[in-house]
């Protein structure tokens, strides 16, 4: 991050008698020659290259811990502050002293489980954690799923030696993989259906989509509402209900659908740590796991992040769209590349707003509820129930009962006295 604080941390290194310790237990090495002597026997991060890591802007501060001088010498500016000997149990105190708001970027060379377990509390909002190494972790580590979702914390990685391979558009992506396999966990609700609609209408989207949904009402609606569109686009669509299958059978069905290569994209809509943890083993070597479910900050998931650097996988999240993103969505709607109306499940007037909020919390409808403030009095009504509540509006619904511009115009004409062109 430009003008941010970058921390580069490696595995443990031996101390020397001539080094001095500060109040945090950090070892300050007075010279490059001394540092080379201290690390000549054991340099876990030896051989890595900086590459184009700083091509997009310089951090205002760079801190290094347990990193060989040969790597530090690749930085020309700003000067690297060396603080060796910081153990994971002191990371929080170290971050408070060096980056009170958290580190904007952390590069971990040859990561260990102990190092990664200690990282969540020291990350700034929007932090990027770049893992670089060739040895698997051997066990899951702590990942703050809530901060990945709400604070846009990202985990990327590479085997090396060029650590910049983790960055940029070629190093990590922000879009569904064309022609790949995608898995939407919790795909029967409003947000899941929007993800599904978008993937099915993408010009170059996935060729195979698996949807998991445990709601007995929503589950069959997925196939009914999206099956025809998937067939039209030549996309394989399958729906599983984990509550209707023994755990081992469900896992086997997921594995059978994904095949040997794994899922290129896994989007976890449900706010459930177990769903995130169980999804990780099904991720392709260079796949992307997106945490979309609204888990609170501090909610820890246990994930084996070895695949992040050994296979170039990504862990990312989103809590919603920026204004710019919303503009991009509208552009797709205007050129008929995205049918947002298909997500509408119920409508109501302004007096139904409270009922709509309660319906949202109760999961009453599988799709979105639209409240029209210019309509003073109309109860929250499922589109299917417009047959009796507003027959002339119902008659203008689209295929499979989808909301349409014509139906909206008739609704406003009848109940708001508004002519909508």
Predicted regions and their residues:
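ADP-ribose/adenylate-binding Rossmann-like module
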Residues: 105-110, 123-140, 265-270, 281-300, ...
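Short beta-strand "acidic-cap" motif of Rossmann-like dinucleotide-binding folds
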Residues: 61-64, 131, 208-212, 291
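Rossmann-fold NAD(P)-binding glycine/threonine-rich loop
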Residues: 117, 133-152, 277, 293-312
């Amino acid at each position: 991050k430009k003008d941010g604080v970058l921390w580069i941390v490696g595995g443990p290194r031996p101390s020397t008698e001539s080094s001095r310790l500060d109040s945090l237990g950090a070892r300050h090495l007075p010279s490059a020659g001394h540092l080379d002597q201290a690390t000549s026997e054991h340099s876990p991060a030896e051989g890595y290259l900086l590459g184009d890591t700083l091509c997009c802007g310089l951090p205002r501060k760079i801190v290094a811990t347990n990193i060989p001088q040969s790597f530090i010498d690749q930085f020309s500016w700003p000067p690297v502050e060396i603080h060796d000997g910081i153990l994971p149990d002191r990371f929080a105190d170290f971050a408070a002293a060096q980056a009170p708001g958290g580190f904007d970027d952390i590069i971990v060379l040859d990561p260990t489980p102990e190092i990664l377990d200690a990282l969540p509390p020291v990350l700034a909002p929007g932090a990027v954690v770049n893992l670089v190494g060739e040895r698997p972790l051997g066990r899951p580590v702590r990942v703050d799923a809530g901060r990945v979702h709400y604070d846009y914390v990202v985990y990327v990685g590479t085997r090396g030696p060029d650590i910049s391979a983790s960055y940029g558009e070629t190093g990590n992506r922000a879009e569904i993989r064309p022609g790949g396999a995608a898995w939407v966990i919790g795909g029967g609700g409003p947000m899941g259906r929007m993800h599904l609609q978008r993937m099915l209408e993408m010009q170059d989207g996935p060729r195979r989509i698996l949807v998991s949904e445990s709601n007995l009402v929503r589950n069959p609606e997925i196939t009914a509402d999206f099956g025809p569109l998937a067939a039209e686009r030549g996309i394989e669509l399958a729906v599983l209900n984990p509550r209707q299958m023994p755990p081992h059978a469900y896992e086997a069905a997921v594995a059978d659908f994904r095949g040997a290569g794994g899922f290129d994209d896994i989007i976890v809509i449900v706010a459930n740590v177990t769903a995130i943890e169980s999804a990780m083993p099904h991720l392709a070597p260079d796949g992307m796991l997106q945490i979309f479910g609204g888990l609170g900050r501090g909610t820890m998931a246990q994930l084996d992040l070895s695949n992040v650097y050994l296979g170039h996988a990504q862990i990312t999240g989103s809590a919603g769209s920026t204004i710019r993103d919303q503009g991009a969505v509208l552009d797709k709607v205007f050129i008929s590349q995205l049918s947002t109306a298909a997500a509408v499940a119920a409508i109501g007037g302004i007096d139904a707003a409270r009922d709509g909020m309660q319906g949202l919390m109760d999961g009453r409808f599988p799709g979105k509820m639209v409240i029209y403030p210019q309509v003073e009095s109309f109860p929250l009504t499922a589109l299917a129930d417009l047959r009796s509540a507003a027959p002339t509006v119902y008659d203008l619904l689209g295929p499979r009962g989808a909301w349409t511009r014509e139906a909206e115009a008739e609704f406003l004409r009848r109940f708001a006295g508004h002519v909508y062109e």
